[in-house]
Amino acid sequence: MKFAVLVFPGSNCDRDMYNAAIKSGVDAAYVDYRETTLDGFDGVLIPGGFSFGDYLRSGAMASVAPIIKEVKRFAKEGKPVLGVCNGFQILTEIGLLPGALLHNDSHLFISRNETLKITNNQTPFTHLYVKNENVVYPVAHGEGHYYCTDEIYRELNDNNQIILKYTNNPNGSYEDIAGIVNKEGNVCGMMPHPERALETLLGTNSGVKLFESMVKSWREQNV
């Protein structure tokens, strides 16, 4: 398995994503936003940061980058796509995930570890976790308030698309939502950073199982 780690101007978690992929026992390579193909890759990781300086709004300018057309094709083919923080914002901007990310209720940038609950462990991103297991991931965002309409929330809930919730909502996210998947289950977006949760020495290794879940799921289907 080989992950593509997308890199936009202003990305600052691309190395963390790359490291997470390598640590999970597979290959990875950086892919510039100006590229137009993802041939040779089996999964896509869209990192956090401030793509294009967050001008217009978070993820808006990245949503029209050349590589995005290929990301959409990749997702349509059922291949795994993970977007974290700014990556989640990009996935909502391009319509691969519903809802939007707004300014935190506090209007402050939040940077700390948060305890979250795995609400669905039947996805390629979470199946090595136990349902309702508490995990600790760092958060680092100013626009992490997940918003959706009541109708979209009902759909997310009915389709079991909500995979991660805050136990102590730091940003005002609707119904404590921290991470979701698309209806097909192969596209995942979350505001917390599992790629920064790989080492107990640094505070938490809760993120290891997310990347190992992705790899195990892919191998079960392709090897």
UniProtKB/Swiss-Prot annotation:
GO terms for cellular component: cytoplasm. Keywords: ATP-binding, Cytoplasm, Glutamine amidotransferase, Hydrolase, Ligase, Nucleotide-binding, Purine biosynthesis. The active site is at C85, H193, E195. GO terms for molecular function: ATP binding; glutaminase activity; phosphoribosylformylglycinamidine synthase activity. CDD domains: GATase1_FGAR_AT. Pfam families: GATase_5. It catalyses: N(2)-formyl-N(1)-(5-phospho-beta-D-ribosyl)glycinamide + L-glutamine + ATP + H2O = 2-formamido-N(1)-(5-O-phospho-beta-D-ribosyl)acetamidine + L-glutamate + ADP + phosphate + H(+); L-glutamine + H2O = L-glutamate + NH4(+). One of its GO terms (biological process) is 'de novo' IMP biosynthetic process. Pathway: Purine metabolism; IMP biosynthesis via de novo pathway; 5-amino-1-(5-phospho-D-ribosyl)imidazole from N(2)-formyl-N(1)-(5-phospho-D-ribosyl)glycinamide: step 1/2. Part of the FGAM synthase complex composed of 1 PurL, 1 PurQ and 2 PurS subunits. HAMAP family: PurQ (MF_00421). This is Phosphoribosylformylglycinamidine synthase subunit PurQ. It comes from Staphylococcus epidermidis (strain ATCC 35984 / DSM 28319 / BCRC 17069 / CCUG 31568 / BM 3577 / RP62A). The lineage of its organism: Bacteria, Bacillati, Bacillota, Bacilli, Bacillales. The gene is purQ.
